[in-house]
Design a protein with these regions (language model features):
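A generic transmembrane alpha-helix motif of multi-pass inner-membrane proteins
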Residues: 378-399, 422-456
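Membrane-embedded translocation segments of transport machinery
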Residues: 2-6, 10, 168, 172-320, ...
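Extracellular loop-to-transmembrane helix junctions
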Residues: 37-63, 143, 389-393
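Helix-loop-helix connectors at the membrane interface of multi-pass transporters/channels
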Residues: 2-3, 77, 110-139, 240-243, ...
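Membrane-interface "cap" regions at the ends of multi-pass membrane proteins
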Residues: 1-31, 60-65, 69-82, 86-93, ...
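Select transmembrane alpha-helical segments in multipass membrane proteins
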Residues: 9-20, 44-48, 86-100, 146-151, ...
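Inter-helical loop and helix-membrane interface segments of multi-pass membrane transporters/permeases
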Residues: 4-7, 35-40, 75-94, 107-164, ...
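Transmembrane helix-boundary motif of multi-pass solute transporters/channels
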Residues: 12-52, 237, 248-251, 255-258, ...
Length: 456
């Protein structure tokens, strides 16, 4: 075992908030949130999401961040700090393994973004609007693999630089740019002819569009969007200084994440309405919305090529800030549990990313005939982590806080900076009752959907 490393730390509140917000504001906001909002009722989905974010999401962010800062350890060590029982180690390891499994396929999607951005920059954006472009690209094998490797190399280079010089510095640059771009593009989108109908659909709740699946889907999106139960917040909490407010930082991350999700919705949904008149089939496009529908929308705009460049720069920045957070969490686990140096840990994680990511990158091409329980590799890794492992990890965190540590200890950690825990009652109620119930609902619903018992 190598010599133990000195614990890294963020420079202060701004460093933590922008890094945590960067982890949260990723493809989940820019890509996933708009197509789910379009599919599950627009304004009513947004309303349900906001309610869940300020209750369920808030509670889990506070709990995970406090757990990390209390122990100064990544997930495995943080859970293990309260006992050596097998259940505690399992809870830590499932939180630690999730980012290791997510970041490879996440980087594949990041590679797709690089390809689209390069096409717009080179003046070939019109080709992206052609029928069959996306399917031909992801099934090409070599092109998809090269783009994935470029994105992976960029991510690893940032993580190699360290917490303060890599993760924090990049987040401090990319997040403000991301905000500005989102406002500019959303402003342009909502002024297109016919776009106001899309604004109304997205912002005005319509009870007629409400269903149980709206709630379940919003719960699942909140996990994906706020980086809950991925080990990231525990890891970032371990880098947080004692004089930084956990509650205040959590509220900043909540606001940042929700505003960017809303901006993403205003970028995409009004533009789709302007393009298609709110055609139901277009709104139901799902994951294809960004890579198939949006290029067609941009092609119909006067400044479509410029908007395409700005949009995919924004998406790339969002993807990078999240991928470095996922990778940092994985690297931190190897540093803590194996005593490895950052460079060795990052190198090993890089090898894992290439091996697992290549399965996803080639899964729609040369490896398309190989499936896992009927799913392509990327879809399987997404299902395994988001639908199965993350709800289990969230339940494990709730049980750790309520049955092992004690809610009072979390409260003490939250008030370390001398400020009162203003939403203590909300936290106590949610962590003891609704959070584990919500996580269990997501788990059961997702598995039932995968087995074909229900349709989401």
């Amino acid at each position: 075992m190598e010599q133990q490393h000195k614990r890294s730390a963020f420079s202060g509140k701004i460093g933590f908030v922008l890094s945590a917000a960067g982890a949260s504001v990723g493809l989940g906001n820019i890509w996933r949130f708009p197509y789910l909002a379009a599919k599950y009722g627009g304004g009513i989905f947004l309303l349900v999401y906001i309610v869940l974010a300020v209750t369920f999401g808030y509670t889990m962010i506070v709990a995970e961040t406090a757990l990390g800062r209390m122990t100064h350890k990544s997930p495995v060590g943080a859970f293990g700090a309260f006992g050596k029982k097998g259940g505690l180690r399992f809870g830590g390891w499932i939180n630690a393994v999730i980012p290791i499994l997510i970041v490879p396929y996440y980087s594949v999607i990041g590679g797709w973004v690089i390809r689209y951005l390069s096409e717009y920059i080179s003046g070939h954006g019109s080709e992206l609007s052609q029928d069959g472009y996306f399917s031909n690209f992801i099934s090409s094998g070599l092109s998809a693999e090269v783009c994935f490797l470029i994105f992976t190399a960029f991510t690893l280079a940032i993580v190699f630089a360290g917490v303060r010089n890599g993760v924090e510095r990049v987040s401090k640059v990319m997040m403000p740019v991301l905000v500005v771009l989102s406002v500019v593009i959303a402003g342009y989108s909502v002024t297109r002819p016919g776009a106001l109908a899309g604004v109304k659909y997205f912002l005005v709740p319509n009870v007629a569009n409400f269903s149980w699946m709206t709630v379940v889907t919003a719960m699942g999106q909140m996990f994906y969007s706020l980086s809950i139960a991925m080990g990231i917040l525990v890891t970032f909490g371990s880098y947080m200084k004692k004089d930084v407010s956990i509650e205040g930082s959590t509220e900043n991350v909540e606001i940042f994440d929700t505003l960017i999700a809303m901006m993403a919705g205003l970028m995409i949904i009004p533009a789709v309405f302007s393009f298609s008149g709110g055609d139901p089939d277009t709104l139901q496009a799902g994951p294809a919305l960004m890579f198939i529908t949006i290029p067609k929308v941009f092609e119909s705009m006067e400044l479509g090529s410029l908007v395409g460049v700005l949009f995919f720069v924004l998406v790339l920045f969002a993807a990078v800030t999240s991928s470095i957070a996922l990778t940092e969490s994985a690297v931190s686990t190897f540093e803590d549990e194996l005593g490895w140096s950052r460079k060795k840990a990052a190198a090993v994680i890089g090898i894992i990313m290439v091996l697992l990511g290549s399965l996803s990158a080639l899964g729609y091409g040369p490896l398309s005939g190989v499936t896992v329980i009927g799913m392509q590799f990327l879809d399987f890794f997404d299902f395994l982590t988001n639908s199965v492992m993350m709800p289990i990890a969230a339940i494990a965190t709730c049980l750790l806080v309520t049955s092992v540590i004690g809610v009072e200890k979390i409260e003490e950690e939250v008030t370390q900076n001398g400020q009162p825990f203003r939403r203590k009652k909300v936290f106590n109620f949610m962590i003891r009752t609704l959070c584990p119930v919500f996580a269990a609902i997501i788990l059961v619903s997702s598995v039932a959907n995968a087995l074909g018992w229900i349709s989401m």
